[in-house]
Amino acid sequence: MPAAAAAGPPYKLVTVNTAPERAARLIGRVVEDMKDRYTIVHAANVAAIEEVEAVVREQQPDLLFTASMWTPEEAQKIVAIAKGVLPVGHGLKTFSLPQGLQVERGPDAVVEHIEEHLPSLLA
């Protein structure tokens, strides 16, 4: 069976990151590393909290990741906005990176952290 067939249905991902190039690069690494288990399509990045509602409404993502530059309170606000836009029962899965992870431990730590938590998030 080809790897793509084993990966299951695609998950549409929206990231919320003020550095869109970095988001694309790091998520690209996760997508590549996990492609035998999951099909993840990075549909969009949102660079500002004020843009979350419009992008989530347009993209209707399955996954929403908030980056480590957001405080826990900001990440909660982003998640609440996203869930408030989607229809009841949509089943949006969210993941917030710990604040400061990128700055303190670098991009490899971000990729590792996502890859460690993705299986339980998608279970």
Question: How should each PLM-predicted stretch be described?
Answer:
Residues 56, 60-92:
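Mid-chain, well-packed structural core segment of small domains
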Residues 1-11, 120-123:
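Eukaryotic N-terminal targeting leaders
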Residues 24-27, 75-76, 107-108:
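Conserved strand-to-helix beginnings and helix N-cap segments that scaffold or border functional pockets
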Residues 37-57:
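A short, well-structured beta->alpha microelement
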Residues 19-23, 69-73, 102:
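Short acidic, S/G/P-rich loop/turn micro-motifs used as interaction or catalytic elements
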Residues 84-123:
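Ser/Thr/Gly-rich flexible loops in soluble cytosolic domains mediating phosphotransfer, phosphorylation
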Residues 12-14, 62-68, 98:
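Short glycine-rich or small-residue beta-strand-to-loop segments that form or flank ligand, phosphate
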Residues 8-40:
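Short, charged N-terminal beta->alpha structural module
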